[in-house]
Amino acid sequence: METISTIAALRERLAAYRRAGKSIGLVPTMGYLHAGHMELVSRARAENDIVVVSIFVNPLQFGANEDLAKYPRDLERDSAILRDGKVDFIFAPGVADMYPRPMETVVDVPKLGTELEGAVRPGHFAGVATVVTKLFNIVQPDSAYFGEKDYQQVAIIRRMVEDLAQPVRVVPVPTVRDADGLALSSRNVYLSTEQRAAAVIVPKALAEAERLYNEGADDPIAFEAALRDFIASEPFATPEVTAVRHPDTLEPLTNLQGQPILVALFVRIGATRLLDNRVVGRKQASSDKAA
């Protein structure tokens, strides 16, 4: 495994593999890796000759009052984890290498990017789309791997790839969860013991959503209100987004029954924002995995 910090060096190393016809898989991350990330790595390893994991805390996707400065960083720890995952390259650039000058060019998918999480984090998904495009340009992967926990992000990247004819296969990978159902996230480290116990309200709310749907709930406004009340019953929890949408377009629905629906939650536990989602009403069972 080799760790590379500059764009030029990574391009040079990958060019030889590309000339030899080797397939390249990219797992973009912001580091502080957990079992969810390693599920992405495992999928990439199974499907590609060469696996690149990028570790870059992207300032473009953080708002003015968000957690850029305190976002957990530990490259030594991450490197040890990735070595066990048989990764070929870690790409760990600095901000000055990725953004040597203030960015004048921004990639935006405005219709998808201003809904749901984008409504409470303006500019976030433009920052995501911009850095992912830049990583695609640098690595030129055949396939790129993203967690389904970030459902909206996957939808945006898929649309971006389609609209811009980027030659990359976008591969969504099922969410990995702790034993109590909480989706793994690098931000879970922010939670105190009490807050971590309270955070289980998020997966419980998804289970409640499935129960309501299976019992025939059809009015999206009442459905969303019921989920807000359910989450708010936990004193540590503040529901910021409780939404039901079309799972492909993310558009609002006028009724729920007779179709699969996306339930999207964005919940603040103390000062920490957690997001989660579930597609309800599809015939196949959930593909989420336990850690």
UniProtKB/Swiss-Prot annotation:
Keywords from the UniProt entry: ATP-binding, Cytoplasm, Ligase, Nucleotide-binding, Pantothenate biosynthesis
Pathway membership: Cofactor biosynthesis; (R)-pantothenate biosynthesis; (R)-pantothenate from (R)-pantoate and beta-alanine: step 1/1
Cited Pfam families: Pantoate_ligase
GO cellular component: cytosol
InterPro entries in alphabetical order: Cyt_trans-like, Pantoate_ligase, Pantoate_ligase_C, Rossmann-like_a/b/a_fold
Annotated EC: 6.3.2.1
Gene Ontology molecular-function annotations: ATP binding; pantoate-beta-alanine ligase activity
Positions that bind ATP: 30-37, 147-150, 176, 184-187
Quaternary state and interactors: Homodimer.
Miscellaneous field: The reaction proceeds by a bi uni uni bi ping pong mechanism.
Family indicated by similarity: Belongs to the pantothenate synthetase family.
Role summary: Catalyzes the condensation of pantoate with beta-alanine in an ATP-dependent reaction via a pantoyl-adenylate intermediate.
Protein's recorded name: Pantothenate synthetase
Organism: Rhizobium rhizogenes (strain K84 / ATCC BAA-868)
Record gene name: panC
